[in-house]
């Protein structure tokens, strides 16, 4: 808040909203969303302003011991929220329904849109796969990274699209696609990591802060 005249309170700048704000003498489009499941904003700005805005944020945050974090940390946190990413969980290999994006699709819209016909056909064909979040048990020295096979009773029934360790919840996680009949919460599956198979349970999406309290705080 020290960097901008725009009020950043929940009342003035709520979750899932956006505004153009000033940051020092820089300008950015601020979106009250993020990819890590915490209270925060995405800042979209001209590339020539990037170093200045970054430096201003770091200086303003010194009293709070602010520190940058890397892409691996961000990936770990997005797994804990079951956030999909292109081209891993969202790909031309499978439909938006298979990626678990049903709530963003309205096939009954009166207007046409790109992909509507293909989406209707994918529904008629019935989804072959469903998106799942997996908790991997008993793995101590390696986590899934993506493309690992997922099995049921020794039969290959899907594959991981992403994986890693969730440090906020202290669990090894994977996102993936499995045959629809094996996608129910509580289903016990296996995943092969570096030649070894581990128990992988289907769990609810967003094992970290499932009600989004932090995002809306």
Please report, for each region that a protein language model flagged, where it lies by residue.
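Conserved, structured C-terminal
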Residues: 1-217
């Amino acid at each position: 808040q020290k960097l901008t005249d725009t009020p950043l309170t929940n009342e003035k700048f709520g979750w899932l909203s956006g505004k153009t704000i000033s940051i020092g003498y820089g300008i950015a489009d601020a979106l009250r969303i993020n990819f890590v499941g915490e209270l925060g904003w995405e800042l979209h700005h001209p590339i020539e302003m990037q170093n200045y805005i970054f430096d201003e944020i770091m200086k303003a945050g010194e009293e709070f011991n602010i520190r940058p974090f890397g892409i691996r940390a961000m990936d770990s946190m997005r797994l804990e929220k079951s956030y999909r990413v292109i081209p891993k969980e969202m790909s031309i290999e499978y439909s938006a329904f298979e990626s678990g994006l049903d709530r963003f699709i309205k096939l009954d819209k009166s207007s046409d849109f790109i992909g509507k016909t293909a989406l209707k056909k994918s529904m008629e064909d019935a989804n072959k796969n469903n998106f799942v979040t997996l908790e991997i048990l008993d793995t101590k020295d390696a986590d899934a990274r993506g493309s690992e096979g997922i099995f049921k009773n020794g039969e290959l029934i899907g594959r991981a699209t992403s994986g890693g360790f969730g440090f906020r919840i202290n669990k090894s996680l994977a996102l993936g696609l499995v045959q629809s009949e094996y996608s129910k919460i509580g289903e016990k599956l296996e995943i092969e990591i570096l030649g070894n198979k581990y128990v992988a349970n289907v769990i609810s999406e967003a094992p970290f802060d499932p009600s989004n309290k932090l995002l809306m705080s």
